[in-house]
Amino acid sequence: MKNLLLILSFFLVFSCSRDEEKVNECKLSTVNVSTLAYDDINISSTYNPNFSEKIRLSYDSQNRISKILGSFIPVMVGSLGSYTISDDAYDEITYSGNSVYVKISANQMIRPYDKEFVILNNKIASQKIIIGTNNLVYNYEYSGNQIVEKINNKLIRTFSIENGNLTKIEKWNYNDSNQIIGKIETIFSDFDNSENLLKNKFFINGAFIKAFSKNNFRNFETKGYVLQNGSYVSDGSYYTKTLAMTYNSENIANVFEKKCN
């Protein structure tokens, strides 16, 4: 009888512990757009009062991100095809095997594109940009600390990884004869020691670049180069930005918010 009570007590404590873990489970709930990069769409600089400056994540029954509130709506007047981000629009995310499908601005009449990602062992293998009946497919090849992005075997970008973080992107420029004539180089620096909660979440719109890194960069600079006599020479273009971040008691950057059950 005494042994039976001990066994029952063990299972009771174990069950309570598991229940407590379940209750205290935390998920990424919001991301401030200051840490995102929408580099494949023309975003209007016009202030939108209907946007909270954060995207908000919802999850399905398997704890996978299924909906993101905060997506694109068109700017109608003098927009030149540009969009703004609004809390009135959301993205829908579905899964099939290794593929992740993202329906951008799912509840809007005018939508810029949809996306499909193939992710293998937390590595991006390909992404497809779907615009109407047209598809643009990017494939990714891995070699040492470099990741090469190609379209139909044409080099588009090279990503350099150091210590688990993306430190450099080189985007190659071509002339009409498909010869490289220059490049745009982006350097990421001043990484913190805080966990990047967007790591491997390539499918979140705007998070593709950040998803390569385990930590958060706090500075980046972009320079343009032209190819002259076999060497890359600065074309004079330059842009830099510093991201101010603070951290909570769990050392999580203030660009993220987590919600615990």
Regions found by a protein language model. Give the residues of each.
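Positively charged n-region of N-terminal signal peptides that target proteins for export
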Residues: 1-5
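Sec-dependent N-terminal signal peptides
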Residues: 6-10
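C-terminal motif of bacterial Sec signal peptides marking the signal peptidase cleavage site
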Residues: 14-15
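Buried hydrophobic residues that stabilize the cores of well-folded domains
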Residues: 18-261
